[in-house]
């Protein structure tokens, strides 16, 4: 017998309301109603675990109730010695290492997932979980018809348990339907491999395109063009100077030739002077 504590229990809730609230989670051996809280006794430990996991925080008569396992009372000697674990039992690993595990651990989803298709709608997650337990395998989590109709997802603690359950359930006839099982174990290394590839490719994207890169030959040609530019300027200057010299030389040659000028008036006067003397008496 396993007892479960009910917190925030409405005062208007009756025994039938509580029994209806826990319907589908196994048989209840006793229901205890108090002022604002209560207790429920389950016959099976696994049914109590599932009820606490799924119904904690759900509404009962319009109020969200709290479901948890009551803590074990610690005696005076245990409290003095420090051996009161309050529901936690010590387990020992190889090598003598001690580890504390909660006896009432909640079902958890793991990466070892088994997908069961073609499941009858008459089978709930509790039914498929109990069916796997009858096969000698303990699942950690199960859900049915939640994501897809006629489909269940069951998780296990190890891949060996998953393989064992898959071999036993594959093709089994449940309520006129043959089950189809698929191993959907999540591999962490495979899920991370694309990220590593994308990271290795990222530096190439950040680099400049090859067209913008300059080869050593282009650098040399640029240097040659730059070094040749002063020569071109000097050639232009030399040509302009030669042209200016040729023009100036032509002008000087024209100025050296004596211009055709008329005789000066003095010479004309000298030629006319004897004529005037002979005519005088």
UniProtKB/Swiss-Prot annotation:
One GO location term (cellular component): nucleus
Keyword Cell cycle: no
Modifications after synthesis and translation: Extensively phosphorylated on serine residues in the RS domain.
Annotated segments matching region Disordered: 78-100, 168-281
Pfam entry (one): RRM_1
Compartments reported by the entry: Nucleus
Subcellular location, principal: nucleus
Stated name of the protein: Probable splicing factor, arginine/serine-rich 2
Lineage summary: Eukaryota, Metazoa, Ecdysozoa, Nematoda, Chromadorea
Span of domain RRM: 2-72, 112-186
Biological source species: Caenorhabditis elegans
Biased composition (Basic residues): 191-215, 245-254
Keywords: Developmental protein, Differentiation, Gonadal differentiation, Growth regulation, mRNA processing, mRNA splicing, Nucleus, Phosphoprotein, Repeat, RNA-binding, Spermatogenesis
Compositionally skewed regions (Basic and acidic residues) per UniProt: 78-97, 168-190, 216-225
CDD domains listed in its UniProt record: RRM1_SRSF4_like, RRM2_SRSF1_4_like
């Amino acid at each position: 017998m396993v007892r479960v504590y009910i917190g925030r229990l409405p005062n208007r809730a009756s025994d039938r309301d509580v029994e209806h609230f826990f319907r589908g989670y196994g048989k209840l051996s006793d229901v205890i109603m108090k002022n604002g809280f209560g207790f429920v006794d389950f016959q099976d430990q696994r049914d109590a675990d599932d009820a606490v996991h799924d119904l904690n925080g759900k509404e009962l008569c319009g109020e969200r109730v709290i479901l948890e396992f009551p803590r074990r009372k610690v005696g005076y000697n245990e409290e003095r010695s420090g051996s009161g674990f309050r529901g936690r039992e010590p387990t020992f690993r190889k090598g003598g290492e001690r580890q504390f595990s909660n006896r009432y651990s909640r079902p958890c989803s793991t990466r070892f997932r088994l997908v069961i298709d073609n499941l009858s709608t008459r089978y709930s997650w509790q039914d498929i979980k109990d069916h796997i337990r009858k096969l000698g395998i303990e699942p950690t989590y199960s859900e049915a018809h939640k994501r897809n109709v006629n489909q269940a997802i069951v998780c296990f603690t190890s891949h060996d348990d998953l393989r064992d359950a898959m071999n036993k359930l594959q093709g089994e006839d449940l309520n006129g339907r043959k089950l189809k099982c698929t191993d959907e174990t999540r591999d962490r290394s495979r899920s991370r491999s694309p990220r590593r590839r994308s990271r290795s490719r990222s530096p190439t994207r950040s680099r400049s395109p090859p067209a913008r890169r300059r080869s050593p030959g282009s650098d040399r040609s640029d240097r040659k063009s730059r070094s040749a530019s002063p020569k071109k300027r000097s050639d232009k200057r030399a040509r302009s100077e030669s042209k200016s010299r040729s023009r100036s030389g032509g002008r000087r040659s024209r100025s050296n030739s004596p211009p055709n000028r008329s005789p000066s008036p003095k010479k004309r006067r000298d030629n006319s002077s004897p004529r005037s003397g002979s005519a005088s008496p």
